[in-house]
């Protein structure tokens, strides 16, 4: 257990490849999304990585990770959020520094948030064209009831209403 309360595990790679994989799981998730702000955790999780950091705009972060041949992804789920990092062992120091910066100093760039919202709105419009999507929604409603977070899907109004300030406030709760 680290000083800040985070539980960390180190597992050796049996393949002996010169690769390092890191996974960070964060307690919290969509169950924290206020009514009317459904999709907040999902937006926050995506924008941690996609929105750059205070010292590295998104394009520079992308370029640096590309140069290192590293994969760094973040997500926000129903009950947890997290980060995945995969890179060469020789680059682990810089990769960990970038991962820490992404987690602790996100910029949540407005242009990247706007793009994410447009993409999510398009996906929402297509939801009724996908039987599997309808099924996931209905199973959540039938299993948990309409007021349970796992059954609450983002509406167009909720997605359009998400702001950079919402992401910053959510970040303060999550990290």
Describe the function of each predicted region.
Residues 1, 171-175:
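Short, intrinsically disordered, charge-balanced linker/junction segments flanking boundaries
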Residues 107-108, 113, 162-164, 170:
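Peptidyl-prolyl cis-trans isomerase
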Residues 128, 169-172:
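A generic local secondary-structure boundary/capping motif
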Residues 9-11, 15-49, 53-104, 117-125, ...:
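M16 family metallopeptidases and their MPP-like homologs
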Residues 2-3, 13:
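Active-site beta-strand termini and strand-to-loop segments that position acidic
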């Amino acid at each position: 257990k680290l000083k800040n309360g985070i539980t960390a595990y180190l597992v050796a790679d049996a393949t002996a490849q010169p690769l390092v994989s890191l996974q960070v799981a964060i307690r919290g998730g969509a169950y924290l999304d206020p009514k009317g702000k459904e999709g907040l955790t999902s937006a926050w999780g995506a924008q941690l990585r996609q929105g750059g950091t205070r010292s590295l705009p998104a394009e520079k972060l992308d370029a640096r990770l590309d140069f290192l041949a590293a994969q760094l992804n973040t997500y926000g789920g129903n009950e947890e959020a997290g980060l995945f990092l995969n890179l060469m062992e020789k680059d682990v120091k810089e990769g960990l520094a970038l991962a820490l910066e992404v987690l602790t100093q996100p910029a949540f760039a407005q242009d990247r948030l706007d793009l994410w919202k447009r993409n999510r709105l398009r996906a929402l419009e297509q939801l009724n064209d996908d039987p599997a999507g309808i099924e996931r929604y209905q199973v959540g409603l039938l299993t948990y009831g309409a007021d349970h977070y796992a059954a609450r899907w983002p509406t167009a109004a909720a997605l359009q209403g998400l702001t950079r300030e919402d992401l910053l406030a959510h970040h303060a709760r999550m990290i």
